[in-house]
Protein backbone atom coordinates (compact mmCIF):
# COMPACT_ATOMS: atom_id res chain seq x y z
CA UNK A 1 0.00 0.00 0.00
CA UNK A 2 1.48 3.31 -1.07
CA UNK A 3 1.44 6.22 1.38
CA UNK A 4 0.21 9.36 -0.39
CA UNK A 5 -0.30 12.91 0.93
CA UNK A 6 -0.69 13.81 4.58
CA UNK A 7 -4.39 14.02 5.45
CA UNK A 8 -4.21 14.89 9.17
CA UNK A 9 -1.58 15.54 11.83
CA UNK A 10 -2.20 15.38 15.55
CA UNK A 11 0.03 15.41 18.62
CA UNK A 12 1.10 11.78 18.34
CA UNK A 13 0.13 10.55 14.86
CA UNK A 14 0.05 11.47 11.20
CA UNK A 15 -2.60 10.04 8.87
CA UNK A 16 -1.81 9.56 5.18
CA UNK A 17 -4.16 8.77 2.33
CA UNK A 18 -3.50 5.67 0.23
CA UNK A 19 -4.60 4.64 -3.26
CA UNK A 20 -7.43 2.70 -1.56
CA UNK A 21 -10.01 5.27 -0.39
CA UNK A 22 -11.09 2.90 2.39
CA UNK A 23 -7.62 2.65 3.95
CA UNK A 24 -5.06 5.02 5.48
CA UNK A 25 -1.53 4.72 6.80
CA UNK A 26 -1.12 5.93 10.37
CA UNK A 27 2.40 6.98 11.36
CA UNK A 28 3.24 7.16 15.07
CA UNK A 29 5.43 10.16 15.95
CA UNK A 30 8.25 10.48 18.48
CA UNK A 31 6.60 13.61 19.91
CA UNK A 32 5.46 13.56 23.54
CA UNK A 33 3.11 15.99 25.25
CA UNK A 34 1.91 16.41 28.81
CA UNK A 35 -0.52 18.59 30.75
CA UNK A 36 -2.89 18.98 27.81
CA UNK A 37 -0.16 19.87 25.32
CA UNK A 38 1.60 22.44 27.54
CA UNK A 39 4.86 20.45 27.80
CA UNK A 40 6.42 19.01 24.64
CA UNK A 41 9.43 16.84 23.89
CA UNK A 42 10.75 14.27 21.42
CA UNK A 43 11.49 10.77 22.67
CA UNK A 44 13.62 8.60 20.40
CA UNK A 45 11.75 5.47 19.19
CA UNK A 46 8.52 6.44 20.96
CA UNK A 47 6.64 6.14 17.67
CA UNK A 48 8.00 2.64 17.04
CA UNK A 49 7.16 1.48 20.56
CA UNK A 50 3.65 2.94 20.47
CA UNK A 51 3.04 1.41 17.05
CA UNK A 52 4.17 -2.03 18.25
CA UNK A 53 2.00 -1.87 21.38
CA UNK A 54 -1.00 -0.55 19.45
CA UNK A 55 -0.60 -3.25 16.77
CA UNK A 56 -0.46 -5.97 19.42
CA UNK A 57 -3.52 -4.70 21.31
CA UNK A 58 -5.65 -3.95 18.25
CA UNK A 59 -4.66 -7.25 16.62
CA UNK A 60 -5.74 -9.06 19.79
CA UNK A 61 -9.08 -7.24 19.86
CA UNK A 62 -9.69 -8.12 16.20
CA UNK A 63 -8.90 -11.79 16.95
CA UNK A 64 -11.46 -11.75 19.77
CA UNK A 65 -14.24 -10.46 17.52
CA UNK A 66 -14.01 -6.80 18.54
CA UNK A 67 -13.88 -4.95 15.23
CA UNK A 68 -11.30 -2.15 15.05
CA UNK A 69 -9.83 0.09 12.38
CA UNK A 70 -6.51 -1.85 12.44
CA UNK A 71 -5.50 -3.96 9.41
CA UNK A 72 -1.76 -4.59 9.84
CA UNK A 73 1.57 -3.08 10.83
CA UNK A 74 3.41 -2.07 7.65
CA UNK A 75 6.56 -0.44 9.10
CA UNK A 76 8.17 -0.07 12.50
CA UNK A 77 6.18 3.11 13.12
CA UNK A 78 3.26 2.68 10.68
CA UNK A 79 -0.03 0.81 10.50
CA UNK A 80 -2.44 0.24 7.66
CA UNK A 81 -5.94 0.99 8.94
CA UNK A 82 -9.50 1.21 7.71
CA UNK A 83 -11.06 4.66 7.38
CA UNK A 84 -13.53 5.16 10.22
CA UNK A 85 -15.57 8.02 11.62
CA UNK A 86 -13.77 9.57 14.60
CA UNK A 87 -16.00 10.09 17.62
CA UNK A 88 -14.38 12.60 20.02
CA UNK A 89 -15.15 10.55 23.12
CA UNK A 90 -12.92 8.68 25.53
CA UNK A 91 -14.55 5.78 27.36
CA UNK A 92 -12.79 4.80 30.58
CA UNK A 93 -13.80 1.38 31.90
CA UNK A 94 -13.36 1.04 35.65
CA UNK A 95 -13.57 -2.22 37.59
CA UNK A 96 -11.41 -0.87 40.42
CA UNK A 97 -11.62 2.60 41.96
CA UNK A 98 -8.36 4.42 41.17
CA UNK A 99 -6.78 7.60 39.89
CA UNK A 100 -8.95 10.58 39.03
CA UNK A 101 -12.15 8.79 40.02
CA UNK A 102 -10.90 8.12 43.55
CA UNK A 103 -9.79 11.74 43.86
CA UNK A 104 -12.97 13.20 42.33
CA UNK A 105 -15.30 11.17 44.57
CA UNK A 106 -13.13 11.03 47.69
CA UNK A 107 -12.94 7.24 47.59
CA UNK A 108 -10.15 4.92 48.63
CA UNK A 109 -8.11 3.52 45.74
CA UNK A 110 -8.43 -0.22 45.23
CA UNK A 111 -12.13 -0.55 46.07
CA UNK A 112 -13.97 -2.92 43.73
CA UNK A 113 -17.48 -1.70 42.86
CA UNK A 114 -20.30 -4.20 42.35
CA UNK A 115 -20.68 -3.10 38.73
CA UNK A 116 -18.44 -1.85 35.93
CA UNK A 117 -18.29 1.95 35.81
CA UNK A 118 -17.98 3.80 32.50
CA UNK A 119 -16.57 7.34 32.55
CA UNK A 120 -17.30 9.27 29.37
CA UNK A 121 -14.99 12.18 28.49
CA UNK A 122 -15.18 14.69 25.66
CA UNK A 123 -11.81 14.59 23.87
CA UNK A 124 -10.09 17.93 23.50
CA UNK A 125 -7.04 19.54 25.08
CA UNK A 126 -8.63 22.99 24.98
CA UNK A 127 -11.24 21.83 27.52
CA UNK A 128 -9.07 19.32 29.38
CA UNK A 129 -11.07 16.23 28.31
CA UNK A 130 -14.05 17.01 30.59
CA UNK A 131 -16.20 14.27 32.09
CA UNK A 132 -19.64 14.26 30.45
CA UNK A 133 -22.71 12.03 30.68
CA UNK A 134 -24.75 10.13 28.10
CA UNK A 135 -27.22 12.99 27.68
CA UNK A 136 -24.41 15.47 26.94
CA UNK A 137 -22.98 13.14 24.27
CA UNK A 138 -26.37 12.80 22.59
CA UNK A 139 -27.25 16.51 22.92
CA UNK A 140 -23.90 17.44 21.33
CA UNK A 141 -24.75 15.20 18.37
CA UNK A 142 -21.74 12.94 18.95
CA UNK A 143 -23.72 9.69 19.25
CA UNK A 144 -27.25 8.37 19.68
CA UNK A 145 -28.44 6.48 22.75
CA UNK A 146 -28.43 3.27 20.66
CA UNK A 147 -24.83 3.90 19.59
CA UNK A 148 -23.83 4.54 23.21
CA UNK A 149 -25.36 1.21 24.22
CA UNK A 150 -23.18 -0.53 21.61
CA UNK A 151 -20.10 1.45 22.70
CA UNK A 152 -20.64 0.39 26.33
CA UNK A 153 -21.27 -3.23 25.32
CA UNK A 154 -18.05 -3.39 23.28
CA UNK A 155 -16.09 -1.53 25.99
CA UNK A 156 -17.25 -4.04 28.61
CA UNK A 157 -15.92 -6.91 26.46
CA UNK A 158 -12.44 -5.44 26.27
Language-model features and meaning:
Residues 2-120:
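Active-site loop/lid in soluble adenylation, ligation, and acyl-transfer enzymes
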Residues 80, 102-158:
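ATP-dependent phospho-/nucleotidyl transfer catalytic cores
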Amino acid sequence: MTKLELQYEGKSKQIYRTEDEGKVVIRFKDDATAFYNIKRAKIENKGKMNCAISSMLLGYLNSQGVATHYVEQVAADEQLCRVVEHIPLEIIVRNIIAGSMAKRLGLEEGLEPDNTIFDLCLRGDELGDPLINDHHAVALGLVSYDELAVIYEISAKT
